[in-house]
Amino acid sequence: MEDFVRQCFNPMIVELAEKAMKEYGEDLKVETNKFAAICTHLEVCFMYSDFHFINEQGESIIVELGDPNALLKHRFEIIEGRDRTMAWTIVNSICNTTGAEKPKFLPDLYDYKENRFIEIGVTRREVHIYYLEKANKIKSEKTHIHIFSFTGEEMATKADYTLDEESRARIKTRLFTIRQEMASRGLWDSFVSPREAKRQLKKDLKSQEQCASSPTKVSRRTSPALKILEPMWMDSNRTATLRASFLKCPKK
């Protein structure tokens, strides 16, 4: 699974996931499914934000990369992917500026158009079950919840899906692609089932010993939203050649 993650996701997303697991004292060599889940969640959050801006009239518009406008403001503030201290600093700043209610748990995004925090969920199970779990944990009507599944289903607070259909379809397609690529490598069952995951982990560790010197192909594309995080953790030279486009897992 670890090899798959490094092949399928952009190196910047992988690096953020590694830092997140390290911050919580988790070993990605052991918890490979969580490593994959974190990378997937990060990518969905960035794709959610991609290309969405607010113009001078306060209207939400979509602007593709290559059509810049200095007067435009990003519609979404990305909170996910930051270290906890910085994330809470951003949340506090938003609350002080907008008067929004401070959430009990760190949300993933803030929507400046709708003036609300957003919790993004990506589930391998039924969307309604995961939605209820999120709602019970957050216990706040102020935080908007939007759940995606690997089967193309989604569920959101009051059926308000925030994004246009095309933007959501891009996210669903990416998730379906990840599922297909996992399945083609025999990883999907272990990603869904904890019991199967333990068996797969033993197999992976044994395989890593045999293939430690094998070269690995890496996707070099990235989400434009990642560039917003860039100053915090990497220099611009490493992102200069990355194209902002929808990621696709490379074939073996």
Swiss-Prot record:
Record-marked site positions (Important for efficient shutoff activity and nuclear localization): 195, 198-199
Highest taxon of the lineage: Viruses
Keyword Metal-binding attributed: no
Disulfide bridges in this chain: none
One MF annotation (Gene Ontology) recorded for this entry: RNA binding
Keywords linked to the UniProt accession: Decay of host mRNAs by virus, Eukaryotic host gene expression shutoff by virus, Host cytoplasm, Host gene expression shutoff by virus, Host mRNA suppression by virus, Host nucleus, Host-virus interaction
Similarity remark: Belongs to the influenza viruses PA-X family.
Domain notes per entry: The probable endonuclease active site in the N-terminus and the basic amino acid cluster in the C-terminus are important for the shutoff activity. The C-terminus acts as a nuclear localization signal. The C-terminus is recruited to host protein complexes involved in nuclear Pol II RNA processing.
Name assigned to this protein: Protein PA-X
Organism: Influenza A virus (strain A/USA:Huston/AA/1945 H1N1)
GN (gene name): PA
